[in-house]
């Protein structure tokens, strides 16, 4: 028997339903394709809520917990890593009405395992319980089978057409797919054929058929989108990209309509057996989202763990520095990406000579470019995903020789593509191995035994595709140098180091590249900036603006391989015989620093007993942990380098050079808070989500991965597209390598200036007010002096939670 459609459901307007669908679309994060994958905050849609409320919402929508098991916190409390004072301080931050009555009750709650999280059921799950048929699995498998073809980015030889949109394309296939009927869903293909022609009309129709109330829409739509896993997030990515370019995209709504057609068909097929359970589910979806007492306890424990880490960080920053200060002109200044992996190398390099100092800046070096590589028509967005490219660049000068080389490279590439398609074609693939297998023996042995060598990028030096006038070049150079707090005291040699990772047999390789460069390596941006700052006309104009670069200062680009800590200098871009001796010395320093950094990294990597083992891991097909990437990230520090130089931050901190005394109007501070800090928060929260909820926010087991459509990976034979980080990226097989802590942001600047920026940017402020990020102001000695407590208020940070009586809140 069919469920009787309620009067409320019938009265729901088209606009109300579509608005709820659009809100649900923004409750899930986007997923970038593998070729340019970047870290994404899985809690992007919950940034306006505190952790305990987000926990309640995601438990209903996904059946997950968003903090670690309580035993994890109990172990740290017992070992003394979390102190009683940390627990007390965290307890005080929780809303008084919802927290335990006292700290003793909180400590008792730690010993009790929290209830297993349960999502509100869908119709598919209710039907599974009644019929003993795995309808959720069948739905996921059929949608995944179609989506892999629809969203394919060149992997499939026979691509599914996309004309008409996702909903229309799916209907064409679903009306001829008898799998649901074979499984027991009678009449499904006919119901799809009879469904409304547009996704929006289908949503309205299904809402009525399912008897949904207005209050249930948001929660139910969110729930259905989470059941789609990465496929919903791929659609969300399309919406993100469209809105970035001033447009829109209906793909998320299309997928939601597809999923709801399955629900409506299952409810119709299930009859009266599903009605009681479904009515209860609708009531649960309609109930307001509210944090439980267990959610509050878990959020307090998470806060206590983060306060313990902040206390340790303050101790490191307050300790005397071992850095040696140069009394004369520096020999080498080397700018790195703020990436936490750079901290290890920077510390190693600076330890070699007092004439060396390093700087930290976002790895795209202020160049928001769309770059076309040599012999390619693909424009790569090499900038933070929050931004749109402002300049289009290409590789090589338009000379006859370069044009001939490009034509030859294109012919070679087309031949390789044709050969690759021949290997995979439906007929030729059967005879391919027998006919040509022997000629691959040498390559198989070389690659299988990790004997192949990585090579530095060989593209010609990049340049703007259309020449930029002097005023534009001058404005760009001045803006970038000021943003780097790098306007004086230039060394003879300044190296701008982008970073990338050279690994093999790794679908997530782009995730190891530079996040600020959109998932690409950073050498192109560094080369462009070096060329700009070596321009004599630009230097003359900068001098008129008060930025004097000595005539003997040479800027060079470099590429830091974060997997092996090898550094490639692009000295041929700007030949300078007068700097030959400097380059020889710098080359030696970089080699020595690389050896030191590899030795430190080897201590954390499994089966890396010596620093020499690191290079082999990068070439090993079977290596599932070539590097730890950004695992362990805990802090973001924007301050002069002197505040962190000579202090061992263990590769856990993003380091951004910033001097507020030179930042008139605090425009640079605003840029740091709204761009690099947000990107760092996405990275931190991706690692956090992949650790606390790997079943939902993690990519699963690398050993089971199959690349699908060039978009992402599935585990095994198909189904749900996995998102986030593989388990091997946060766990070494015995213990967690990433400690799931929300990022602590430390800024050396007046609290009034920071507060004014937060007030102008509500979305940024929400991250701090709801404690997705912690915020501290450093004093003039680089010590943590003030803690942001929300609502534009600050308290004195004393470094020891026991001194709560010294708390003094002020309004910034």
From Swiss-Prot:
Chain positions recorded as Zn(2+) binding sites: 337, 339, 499, 514
Required cofactor names: Zn(2+)
Keyword Zinc: yes
InterPro entries tied to this protein: DabA
Membrane topology annotation: Peripheral membrane protein
Family: Belongs to the inorganic carbon transporter (TC 9.A.2) DabA family.
Subunit organization: Forms a complex with DabB.
Record's protein name: Probable inorganic carbon transporter subunit DabA
Protein source organism: Xanthomonas oryzae pv. oryzae (strain KACC10331 / KXO85)
Gene assigned in the entry: dabA
């Amino acid at each position: 028997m069919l469920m009787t459609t309620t009067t409320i459901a019938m009265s729901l307007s088209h606009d109300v339903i579509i608005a709820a669908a659009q809100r649900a679309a923004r409750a899930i994060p986007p997923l970038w394709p593998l070729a340019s994958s970047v870290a994404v905050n899985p809690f992007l849609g919950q940034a306006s809520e505190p952790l305990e409320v987000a926990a309640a919402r995601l438990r209903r929508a996904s059946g997950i917990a968003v903090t670690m098991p309580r035993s994890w916190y109990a172990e740290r409390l017992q070992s003394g890593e979390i102190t009683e004072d940390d627990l007390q301080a965290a307890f005080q931050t929780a809303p008084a009405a919802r927290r335990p009555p006292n700290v003793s009750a909180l400590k008792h709650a730690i010993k009790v395992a929290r209830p297993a999280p349960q999502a509100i059921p869908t119709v598919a799950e209710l039907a599974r319980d009644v019929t003993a048929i795995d309808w959720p699995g069948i739905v996921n498998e059929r949608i995944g089978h179609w989506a892999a073809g629809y969203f394919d980015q060149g992997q499939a030889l026979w691509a599914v057409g996309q004309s008409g949109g996702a909903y229309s394309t799916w209907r064409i296939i679903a009306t001829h797919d008898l799998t649901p009927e074979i499984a027991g869903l009678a009449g499904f293909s006919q119901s799809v054929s009879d469904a409304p022609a547009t996704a929006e009309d289908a949503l309205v129709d299904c809402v009525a058929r399912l008897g949904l109330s207005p209050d249930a829409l948001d929660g139910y739509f969110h729930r259905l989108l989470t059941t789609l896993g990465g496929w919903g997030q791929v659609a969300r990515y399309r919406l993100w990209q469209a809105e970035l370019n001033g447009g829109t995209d209906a793909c998320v709504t299309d997928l939601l309509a597809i999923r709801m057609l399955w629900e409506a068909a299952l409810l119709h097929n299930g009859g009266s057996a599903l009605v009681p359970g479904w009515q209860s589910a609708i009531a649960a979806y309609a109930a307001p989202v509210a944090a439980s007492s267990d959610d509050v306890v878990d959020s307090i424990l998470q806060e206590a763990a983060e306060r313990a880490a902040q206390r340790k960080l303050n101790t490191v920053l307050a300790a005397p520095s071992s850095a040696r200060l140069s009394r004369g002109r520096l020999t080498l200044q080397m700018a790195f990406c703020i990436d936490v992996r750079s901290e290890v190398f920077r510390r190693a390099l600076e330890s070699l000579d007092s004439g060396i100092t390093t700087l930290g800046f976002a790895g795209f070096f202020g160049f928001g470019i769309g770059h076309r590589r040599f012999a390619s028509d693909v424009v790569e967005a090499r900038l933070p995903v929050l931004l749109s490219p402002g300049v289009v660049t290409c590789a090589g000068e338009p000379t006859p020789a370069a044009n001939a080389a490009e034509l030859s490279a294109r012919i070679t590439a087309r031949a390789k593509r044709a050969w690759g398609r021949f290997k995979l074609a439906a007929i030729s693939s059967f005879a391919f191995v027998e006919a040509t297998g022997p000629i691959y023996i040498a390559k198989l042995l070389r690659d299988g035994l990790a004997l192949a060598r990585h090579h530095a990028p060989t593209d010609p030096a990049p340049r703007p595709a259309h020449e930029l006038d002097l005023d534009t070049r001058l404005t760009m150079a001045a803006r970038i140098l000021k943003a780097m707090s790098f306007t004086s005291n230039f060394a003879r040699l300044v190296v701008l180091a982008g970073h990338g990772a050279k690994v093999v047999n790794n679908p997530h390789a782009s995730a190891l590249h530079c996040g600020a460069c959109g998932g690409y390596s950073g050498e192109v941006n560094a080369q462009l900036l070096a060329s700009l700052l070596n321009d004599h006309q630009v230097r003359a104009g900068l001098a008129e603006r008060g930025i004097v670069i000595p005539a003997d200062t040479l800027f060079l680009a470099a590429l830091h391989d974060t997997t092996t800590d090898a550094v490639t200098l692009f000295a041929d871009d700007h030949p300078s015989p007068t700097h030959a001796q400097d380059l020889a010395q710098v080359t030696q320093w970089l080699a020595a620093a690389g050896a030191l950094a590899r030795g430190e990294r080897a201590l954390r990597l499994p089966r890396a007993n010596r620093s020499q083992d690191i290079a082999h891991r990068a070439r090993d097909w079977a290596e599932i942990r070539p590097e730890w990437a950004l695992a362990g990230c805990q802090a973001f520090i924007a301050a002069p380098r002197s505040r962190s130089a000579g202090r061992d931050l263990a590769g856990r901190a993003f380091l951004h050079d910033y001097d507020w005394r030179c930042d008139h109007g605090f425009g640079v501070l605003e840029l740091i808070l709204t761009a690099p800090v947000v990107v760092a928060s996405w990275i931190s929260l991706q690692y956090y989500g992949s650790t606390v909820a790997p079943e939902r926010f993690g990519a699963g087991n690398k050993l089971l991965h199959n690349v699908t459509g060039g978009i992402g990976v599935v585990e095994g034979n198909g189904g749900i597209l996995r998102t986030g980080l593989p388990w091997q990226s946060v766990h070494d097989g015995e213990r967690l390598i990433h400690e799931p802590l929300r990022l602590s942001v430390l800024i050396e600047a007046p609290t009034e200036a920071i507060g004014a920026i937060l007030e102008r940017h509500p979305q940024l402020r929400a991250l701090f007010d709801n404690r997705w990020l912690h915020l501290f102001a450093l004093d003039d000695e680089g010590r943590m002096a003030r803690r942001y407590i929300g609502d534009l208020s600050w308290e004195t940070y004393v470094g020891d939670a026991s001194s709560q009586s010294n708390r003094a809140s002020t309004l910034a």
